[in-house]
């Protein structure tokens, strides 16, 4: 049996996931990473990504994870994020509309917060890919 760790994923609205996990794959500003039990402690900024976790029962769960903070220590992994969604919770039409709006904002450039628009585009693309 694989070693596990406590995992808690929290959004402003709810506790998205709380339980034991064998591993979780996600993406930080430094790149893609995989967290296993007894991982060295660190804190990182998360970017929107399609993530995957393996529960203590060996069940694979895929989900969308928005920006946030990842805190890892030897006892647990805590993710505080803007949003987390299972594939069945994602409204594909809404995500496609968000993608279109972000692309339109980026094409204008004047008076547009480019970083914010790029972030919105990345988030929409990842949500669409998840469904």
Curated annotation (Swiss-Prot):
Tree of life domain: Bacteria
Q: Which GO terms describe its molecular function?
A: ATP binding; proton-transporting ATP synthase activity, rotational mechanism
UniProt keywords (A-Z) are: ATP synthesis, Cell membrane, CF(1), Hydrogen ion transport, Ion transport, Membrane, Transport
* Pfam families per record: ATP-synt_DE, ATP-synt_DE_N
Q: Where in the cell is it found?
A: Cell membrane
Question: InterPro entries from the entry?
Answer: ATP_F1_dsu/esu_C_sf, ATP_synth_F1_dsu/esu, ATP_synth_F1_dsu/esu_N, ATP_synth_F1_esu_C, ATPsynth_dsu/esu_N
Major location category of this protein: membrane
Q: What membrane topology was assigned to this protein in its record?
A: Peripheral membrane protein
Report one GO cellular component: plasma membrane
Q: Does the keyword Ion transport apply?
A: yes
Q: How does it assemble?
A: F-type ATPases have 2 components, CF(1) - the catalytic core - and CF(0) - the membrane proton channel. CF(1) has five subunits: alpha(3), beta(3), gamma(1), delta(1), epsilon(1). CF(0) has three main subunits: a, b and c.
This chain's function reads: Produces ATP from ADP in the presence of a proton gradient across the membrane.
Report the family membership: Belongs to the ATPase epsilon chain family.
Protein name as annotated: ATP synthase epsilon chain
